[in-house]
């Protein structure tokens, strides 16, 4: 019995040794400027960043002037029972918010829990911006065996520091503006040890402030909705580090 227990412990240690660290927890929030309790979700997201938590945030607007085909698709994909609803790597939903108080204390435990889960994938990217043409070259690798199938690579352009008066708030952050190449994502099927490069492109609206945009890339099991790995790049970092 002792030998079996030691073997199980050793096997568990090996799994964590060979697993890939999780870069970031992807936090997606279904929200809308018409929603009374959505300020708490927005403040919670802002507080995660302000406190240095390892997150990439995407706010998917629905039913307002910031909603678009991309945010509506993500909202429909999760099909939340109410707004706001926050998802942590596609899982562990927090439904509801607050009109005046941050949801940070509700969000933090879920971030901590997901960040402790190792990944089997890595993602890196470079980019170029030619006028309004944004081109992303994403490299995905699977250094360890993984049982997930139906995996999609999603690439989201978010904009922050948008001055807008809503529900007692003065700005919007992490607004889902664009998904490359579209809201459906790109199929990823890799053998263990394999690496693949994906070219993603789209058109940036010149009305957006490109200097406050981020690019968020993540791999998601389209069936279970679990996000397997996520990274983010500020616009300047993506362009400079080629």
Q: Which residue stretches match the model-derived regions?
A:
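Bacterial Sec-dependent N-terminal signal peptides
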Residues: 1-23
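Hydrophobic transmembrane signal anchors and adjacent membrane-proximal interface regions, especially
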Residues: 3-4, 24, 113, 238
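Generic hydrophobic/packing signal
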Residues: 17, 29-31, 85, 134
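Local sequence-structure signature of Cys/Sec-based thiol-disulfide redox active-site neighborhoods
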Residues: 20-56
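Short, conserved sequence motifs used for protein processing/export or organelle targeting and
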Residues: 43, 53-242
């Amino acid at each position: 019995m002792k030998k079996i227990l030691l073997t199980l412990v050793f096997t568990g240690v090996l799994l964590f040794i060979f697993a890939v660290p999780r870069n970031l927890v992807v936090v997606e929030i279904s929200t809308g400027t018409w929603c009374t309790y959505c300020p708490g979700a927005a403040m919670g997201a802002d507080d995660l960043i302000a406190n240095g938590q390892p997150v990439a945030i995407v706010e998917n607007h629905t039913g307002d002037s910031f909603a678009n085909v991309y945010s509506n698709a993500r909202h429909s994909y999760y099909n939340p029972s109410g707004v706001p609803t926050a998802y942590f790597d596609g899982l562990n939903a927090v439904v509801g918010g607050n009109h005046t108080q941050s949801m940070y204390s509700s969000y933090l435990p879920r971030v901590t829990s997901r960040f402790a889960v190792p990944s089997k994938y890595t993602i890196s990217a470079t980019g170029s911006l030619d006028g309004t043409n944004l081109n992303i070259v994403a490299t995905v690798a699977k250094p360890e065996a993984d049982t997930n199938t139906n995996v999609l690579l999603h690439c989201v352009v978010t904009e922050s520091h948008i001055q807008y008066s809503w529900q007692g708030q003065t700005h919007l952050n992490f607004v889902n503006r664009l998904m490359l190449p579209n809201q459906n994502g790109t199929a990823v099927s890799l053998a263990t040890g394999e690496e693949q490069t994906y070219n993603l492109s789209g058109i940036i609206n010149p009305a957006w402030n490109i200097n406050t945009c981020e690019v968020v890339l993540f791999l998601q099991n389209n069936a279970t909705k679990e996000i397997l790995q996520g990274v983010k790049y500020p616009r300047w970092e993506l362009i400079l580090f080629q």
